[in-house]
Amino acid sequence: KKINLEMVKAGFKQGLYETDTLIADQDRQELVQNFIMDLNVINSEKMMTNAKKIKGAQVFDNGIVLQTIEEGTGKNPTELDDVIVEYILTNALGDTVQSSYQMKKMSGSTEPVALALNGGVIPGWTFVVPKMKKGGKYRTYIPWQMAYGEQAGKESLCFFIELVEIGPGGTLVKPQAPMPQQGGF
């Protein structure tokens, strides 16, 4: 596609002089969101295609890819268990989005993250973590449909996961106490 320089000039003038734009704010927001979603789909498809080519990786029918980096020696959790993990989350471009290691450093904590596989994680984790063994280190590629879906812009994710501990549901992740309600009874 070619860039229409007249439209670019008009856009700069409108921005400079703070005049109305050719596209309404809501329409512009929707266009940008759709553009980002389209880019996410392209980048996600590329990441997932490459992941499926990793030698020795398991590819499941739901599109999830699991690569064993270091096999654990313990048992596998069930979908109803709680787990304690260390993890690094990257997007389809390889940028680190979140890291339990960084969160510990920033908070001064020494504890890994406790998660409930039954409702406390994305569907991809509920499926793939039970394929891991305690003590193991894994990389898993999760298609957007098994991650946060459309609400997160159709972005597929890659996780490095170290499975530290396994416990029956409710033993490692304590239920949150209900917050007191404002305004009395």
Task: Locate each region found by the language model.
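Cross-family detector of peptidyl-prolyl cis-trans isomerase
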Residues: 1-185
